[in-house]
Amino acid sequence: MDNCIFCKIINGEIPSATIYENDEFKVILDRFPGNIGHALILPKKHYANIFEIDEETAGRLFKLAVMVAKHIKETLNIEALNIVQNNGELAGQTVNHFHLHL
Protein backbone atom coordinates (compact mmCIF):
# COMPACT_ATOMS: atom_id res chain seq x y z
CA MET A 1 0.00 0.00 0.00
CA ASP A 2 1.57 3.25 -1.14
CA ASN A 3 0.10 5.51 1.54
CA CYS A 4 0.35 3.15 4.52
CA ILE A 5 2.70 4.45 7.23
CA PHE A 6 3.24 0.94 8.62
CA CYS A 7 4.13 -0.42 5.16
CA LYS A 8 6.65 2.42 4.86
CA ILE A 9 8.12 1.50 8.27
CA ILE A 10 8.28 -2.18 7.29
CA ASN A 11 10.02 -1.27 4.00
CA GLY A 12 12.57 0.94 5.79
CA GLU A 13 11.28 4.18 4.26
CA ILE A 14 10.51 5.56 7.73
CA PRO A 15 12.85 4.84 10.67
CA SER A 16 11.55 2.90 13.65
CA ALA A 17 12.76 1.49 16.95
CA THR A 18 12.60 -2.17 15.97
CA ILE A 19 12.78 -4.61 18.88
CA TYR A 20 12.16 -7.83 16.92
CA GLU A 21 11.82 -8.84 13.30
CA ASN A 22 11.42 -12.02 11.30
CA ASP A 23 10.28 -12.82 7.74
CA GLU A 24 6.62 -12.26 8.59
CA PHE A 25 6.43 -9.64 11.37
CA LYS A 26 8.13 -6.53 12.67
CA VAL A 27 7.81 -5.39 16.30
CA ILE A 28 8.47 -1.72 16.98
CA LEU A 29 8.19 0.67 19.88
CA ASP A 30 5.26 3.04 19.46
CA ARG A 31 6.38 6.60 18.58
CA PHE A 32 3.61 7.98 20.79
CA PRO A 33 3.46 5.43 23.61
CA GLY A 34 0.49 5.13 25.91
CA ASN A 35 2.84 3.69 28.52
CA ILE A 36 6.43 2.55 28.98
CA GLY A 37 7.27 -0.34 26.67
CA HIS A 38 4.30 0.28 24.34
CA ALA A 39 5.06 -1.92 21.34
CA LEU A 40 3.30 -2.66 18.05
CA ILE A 41 3.35 -5.98 16.22
CA LEU A 42 3.04 -5.36 12.48
CA PRO A 43 2.49 -8.09 9.88
CA LYS A 44 4.76 -7.35 6.94
CA LYS A 45 1.95 -8.26 4.56
CA HIS A 46 -0.67 -5.52 4.44
CA TYR A 47 -4.01 -6.45 5.97
CA ALA A 48 -6.38 -3.52 6.57
CA ASN A 49 -7.96 -5.14 9.64
CA ILE A 50 -8.69 -8.41 11.42
CA PHE A 51 -11.37 -9.27 8.86
CA GLU A 52 -8.68 -9.68 6.18
CA ILE A 53 -6.06 -11.67 8.10
CA ASP A 54 -6.06 -15.45 7.69
CA GLU A 55 -6.27 -17.74 10.72
CA GLU A 56 -2.79 -19.22 10.28
CA THR A 57 -1.13 -15.80 10.21
CA ALA A 58 -3.25 -14.67 13.18
CA GLY A 59 -2.11 -17.75 15.12
CA ARG A 60 1.56 -17.01 14.45
CA LEU A 61 1.01 -13.35 15.34
CA PHE A 62 -0.53 -14.19 18.71
CA LYS A 63 2.23 -16.71 19.43
CA LEU A 64 4.67 -13.85 18.83
CA ALA A 65 2.51 -11.58 21.03
CA VAL A 66 2.98 -13.99 23.95
CA MET A 67 6.76 -13.93 23.45
CA VAL A 68 6.87 -10.12 23.20
CA ALA A 69 4.56 -9.68 26.21
CA LYS A 70 6.80 -11.91 28.34
CA HIS A 71 9.87 -9.99 27.18
CA ILE A 72 8.27 -6.63 28.04
CA LYS A 73 7.14 -7.95 31.43
CA GLU A 74 10.58 -9.29 32.33
CA THR A 75 12.59 -6.39 30.89
CA LEU A 76 10.51 -3.63 32.47
CA ASN A 77 9.61 -5.57 35.63
CA ILE A 78 5.90 -4.83 35.21
CA GLU A 79 2.99 -6.73 36.71
CA ALA A 80 0.46 -6.36 33.90
CA LEU A 81 -0.04 -5.16 30.34
CA ASN A 82 -2.85 -4.63 27.85
CA ILE A 83 -3.20 -6.12 24.40
CA VAL A 84 -5.35 -3.96 22.13
CA GLN A 85 -6.43 -4.35 18.52
CA ASN A 86 -8.91 -1.92 16.89
CA ASN A 87 -10.85 -2.62 13.68
CA GLY A 88 -12.46 0.23 11.80
CA GLU A 89 -12.74 3.94 12.45
CA LEU A 90 -15.64 3.55 14.90
CA ALA A 91 -13.51 1.14 16.94
CA GLY A 92 -10.61 3.61 17.12
CA GLN A 93 -8.44 2.25 14.31
CA THR A 94 -6.34 5.14 13.01
CA VAL A 95 -3.95 3.25 10.70
CA ASN A 96 -5.56 0.86 8.23
CA HIS A 97 -2.87 -1.80 8.59
CA PHE A 98 -3.65 -4.60 11.04
CA HIS A 99 -1.48 -4.24 14.13
CA LEU A 100 -1.47 -5.32 17.73
CA HIS A 101 -0.67 -2.97 20.62
CA LEU A 102 1.13 -4.35 23.68
Segments (PLM) and residue ranges:
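HIT superfamily nucleotide-processing domains
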Residues: 1-102
